[in-house]
Amino acid sequence: GAPICGESCFTGKCYTVQCSCSWPVCTRN
């Protein structure tokens, strides 16, 4: 799978740069 960004995105939004929400976690683009 895609690398984890160390951020959850239960709200559907990621704040980490170059990461996108693959609910419920952010993954590196």
Curated annotation (Swiss-Prot):
- PROSITE patterns, A to Z: CYCLOTIDE, CYCLOTIDE_MOEBIUS
Q: Position(s) of the covalent cross-link Cyclopeptide (Gly-Asn)?
A: G1-N29
**Keyword ATP-binding recorded:** no
Q: How is it modified after translation?
A: This is a cyclic peptide.
Annotated GO biological process = defense response
Pfam families xrefs: Cyclotide
Keyword list, A-Z: Disulfide bond, Knottin, Plant defense
Function of the protein: Probably participates in a plant defense mechanism.
**Family listed:** Belongs to the cyclotide family. Moebius subfamily.
* Protein's name according to its UniProt entry: Vodo peptide M
Q: What is the lineage of its organism?
A: Eukaryota, Viridiplantae, Streptophyta, Embryophyta, Tracheophyta
